[in-house]
């Protein structure tokens, strides 16, 4: 039986009253969970230990109005940024202490201006009211640190993925688990490592995708609730998968072939690209690893034929133009880098465009989020 616990808002209030009695047990449980999160340091930086006291932005999203940005931090803080207010205003940012563990992924609920769903490295799924910080609903996937969550286009379903290698599909109305998605054909693979990205298709309401550390993208049919196909290649270590119509974009935490494109109509990889970073030819840059950006996140611009990728090591954000992407065998010459932010001071973990496509927000290993105007 799948170990998933669901709690309503009234139950949340009751549980809060019992917290003091459970502190000793919680401290022991929390320490155990923190020890089990050693893998998370590899996601954050290949050469540094995880620091629970340093506030880093792991996930962020514009809402559909372009007025608000939700950002999740390593300290368990949820930040809501009001784009209609000046940055120096007290109303520009509201902060809510949601969890003692990192918020690893979040999404705004479709057709709802005030509800955010987020997941934590402790295994919690929380729905939060953006204007008050009140927890509306909580679900716990016990002993399963969660890395990703996504809503279906109509907001009726959401899916999660994490440490235990399974994608779970939930009914948003009842907040109940529909099914832990598995394969039913042995000629198809299943995930053999942690899942870092889940994505519902906006074009096909019956299509859901997942990817992670096992270099495999699984495709699920929502109607049969099972694996229907797969793609091989990307080593995903963050919000590193995006869809636009039939085009799938992925980025990898690898030193080579970090950007891969797939055509879902043919279930075929159509492009593999190296994240080349030009450096001055000097003694400090003879090691090729110095010129590599290990990528975490990617996003299609909703209004034109560009996409953004972000990464670490060489802390980088780059925007590509794929306007000439009209053939089955795409070469690097057909994908043009049109804008770079190179040698950022901190690893860049996440990015998002507003719905108009004229602004890009990105988050990194520092508290403040940053913007690019794209006009």
Placement of each model-derived feature along the sequence:
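Blade-level signature of beta-propeller repeat domains, shared across WD40, Kelch, NHL, RCC1
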Residues: 350, 354-375
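A short helix->beta-strand "capping" segment at the edge of beta-propeller domains
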Residues: 29-55, 88-91, 334-335
């Amino acid at each position: 039986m799948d170990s998933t616990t669901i709690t309503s808002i009234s139950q949340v209030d009751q549980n809060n009253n019992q917290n003091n009695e459970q502190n000793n047990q919680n401290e022991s449980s929390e320490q155990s969970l923190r020890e089990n999160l050693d893998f998370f340091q590899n996601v954050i930086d290949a050469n540094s230990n995880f620091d629970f006291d340093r506030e880093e932005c792991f996930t962020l999203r514009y809402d559909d109005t372009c007025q608000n940005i939700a950002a999740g931090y390593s300290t368990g803080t949820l930040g809501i940024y009001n784009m209609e207010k000046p940055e120096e205003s007290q109303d520009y940012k509201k902060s809510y202490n949601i969890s003692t563990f990192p918020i690893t992924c979040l999404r705004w609920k479709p057709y709802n201006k005030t509800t955010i769903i987020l997941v934590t490295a402790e295994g919690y799924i929380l729905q939060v009211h953006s204007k008050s910080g009140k927890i509306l609903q909580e679900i716990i996937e016990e002993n399963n640190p969660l890395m990703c969550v996504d809503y279906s286009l109509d907001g009726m379903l959401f899916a999660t993925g994490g440490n235990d290698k399974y994608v779970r599909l939930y009914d948003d109305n009842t907040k109940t688990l529909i099914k832990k998605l598995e394969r039913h054909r042995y000629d198809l693979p299943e995930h053999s490592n942690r899942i870092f990205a889940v994505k519902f298709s906006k074009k096909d309401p019956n299509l859901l995708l997942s990817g992670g550390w096992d270099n495999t993208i699984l495709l699920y049919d929502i109607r049969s609730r099972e694996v229907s196909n797969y793609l091989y290649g990307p080593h995903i270590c963050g919000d590193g998968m995006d869809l636009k119509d039939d085009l799938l974009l992925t980025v990898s935490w690898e030193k080579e072939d970090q950007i891969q494109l797939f055509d879902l109509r043919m279930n075929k990889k159509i492009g593999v690209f190296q994240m080349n970073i030009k450096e001055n030819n000097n003694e400090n840059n003879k090691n090729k690893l110095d010129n590599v950006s290990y990528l975490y996140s990617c996003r299609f611009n909703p209004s034109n034929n560009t996409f953004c990728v972000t990464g670490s090591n060489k802390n980088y954000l780059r925007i590509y133009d794929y306007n000439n992407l009209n053939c089955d065998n795409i070469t690097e010459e057909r994908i043009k880098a049109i804008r770079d932010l190179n040698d950022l001071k901190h690893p860049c973990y996440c990015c998002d465009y507003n719905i108009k496509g004229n602004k890009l927000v990105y988050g990194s290993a520092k508290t403040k989020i940053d913007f690019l105007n794209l006009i």
